[in-house]
């Protein structure tokens, strides 16, 4: 299979490396092209045969093709491919999907989060609000005929690049897209499950970042394992409520893109979003936290959008609201915890 991975950050590079190495045990070797927008980055990747900025210590397979440097090179990178993987940040999804809208092969994205704003006329009145959109909603606006999907789940890029066992979910309303993702990536170190609930898979992947900030805060304040378990469980309830209100199936959130991704991001030491909470608990300002990270922490940028969309749908999300207040400097860490603990008693499973 010929696969183009567009975006040479940590996750795009990791997936390209994994696919290029895949062979044996019934898995055929793929021809994989990794594309980067920046020509200088491509030159560095070619010279070093490694992505030293995002995945130091991981060698790029000799078979991995490298391209990049602009729209012309993008056209070359996707020409003749069987599958296109969009591994760019959410902020670039609209531009990339617009350029790929006439693609004749399946396109799947790895992005987890929301756009900062609505940049074009919405495809339906339900989207005519000043809220950022998830990538499947952007696709509905700019590339409605594209056979598309989302590839998500509990996964740190470094572990995928190392070939450590990982399970992901390929979600699309098109069976062809699901089958292409399974054929491309299911193998010795990646187990790929299929789903037709794109909305649920995207909501889980996006909103868990906000909950991971809260989990980091919990750990940073040394509130204990009981508190962490409670926060993860109630965070999942909030994610599920929002997802169902947006059209997802509740059971999707018990799977890899819901519970799985939340547990990993809320507890893993490689989680940038969890680190945000840890540093805020130490008394650092948000500006100091972002400067120290060096990479994107999507939870910081999508927290307000999550709360806005929840409010527009009448969905109660107190943990997400507390995270926004904390990021805005309106609450101290200890105050956020106190507010959550002082809420009125409720029935546990009266969620959706």
UniProtKB/Swiss-Prot annotation:
Binding locations of NADPH: 11, 37, 112, 157, 272, 296, 298
Keywords: Cytoplasm, Lipid biosynthesis, Lipid metabolism, NAD, NADP, Nucleotide-binding, Oxidoreductase, Phospholipid biosynthesis, Phospholipid metabolism
Biological process according to GO: carbohydrate metabolic process; glycerol-3-phosphate biosynthetic process; glycerol-3-phosphate catabolic process; glycerophospholipid metabolic process; phospholipid biosynthetic process
SUPFAM superfamilies tied to this protein: 6-phosphogluconate dehydrogenase C-terminal domain-like (SSF48179), NAD(P)-binding Rossmann-fold domains (SSF51735)
Chain coiled-coil ranges: none
Catalytic activity: sn-glycerol 3-phosphate + NAD(+) = dihydroxyacetone phosphate + NADH + H(+); sn-glycerol 3-phosphate + NADP(+) = dihydroxyacetone phosphate + NADPH + H(+)
GO molecular function: glycerol-3-phosphate dehydrogenase [NAD(P)+] activity; NAD binding
Keyword Cell division: no
Binding site for sn-glycerol 3-phosphate: 112, 153, 155, 208, 261, 271-273
InterPro entries documented for this protein: 6-PGluconate_DH-like_C_sf, 6PGD_dom2, G3P_DH_NAD-dep, G3P_DH_NAD-dep_C, G3P_DH_NAD-dep_N, NAD(P)-bd_dom_sf
Active site: 208
EC number: 1.1.1.94
Subcellular location: Cytoplasm
GO cellular component, one term: cytosol
Pathway: Membrane lipid metabolism; glycerophospholipid metabolism
Keyword Cytoplasm: yes
Family classification: Belongs to the NAD-dependent glycerol-3-phosphate dehydrogenase family.
Protein role: Catalyzes the reduction of the glycolytic intermediate dihydroxyacetone phosphate (DHAP) to sn-glycerol 3-phosphate (G3P), the key precursor for phospholipid synthesis.
Designated name of the protein: Glycerol-3-phosphate dehydrogenase [NAD(P)+]
Taxonomy of the source species: Bacteria, Pseudomonadati, Pseudomonadota, Betaproteobacteria, Burkholderiales
